[in-house]
Amino acid sequence: MEKYCELVRKRYAEIASGDLGYVPDALGCVLKVLNEVAADSALSESVREKAAYAAANLLVSDYVNE
């Protein structure tokens, strides 16, 4: 957990304690958020590219592993 930022660690603790809801479809949740970030024209192009690249890699790995 140390390699993740403070906000990620905080949300992890909240989910683990039951204070924040757990999403069973974690991959779907991640892809939805990455897609939203990639599509948000208010964000910098570099952030949008990182999100798009991460989403595309998840989609490829999910497809290849089936």
UniProtKB/Swiss-Prot annotation:
InterPro entries: UPF0253
Lineage: Bacteria, Pseudomonadati, Pseudomonadota, Gammaproteobacteria, Enterobacterales
Annotated organism of origin: Salmonella typhimurium (strain LT2 / SGSC1412 / ATCC 700720)
Similarity remark: Belongs to the UPF0253 family.
Lineage: superkingdom: Bacteria
Gene: yaeP
Stated name of the protein: UPF0253 protein YaeP
Residue intervals passing through the bilayer: none
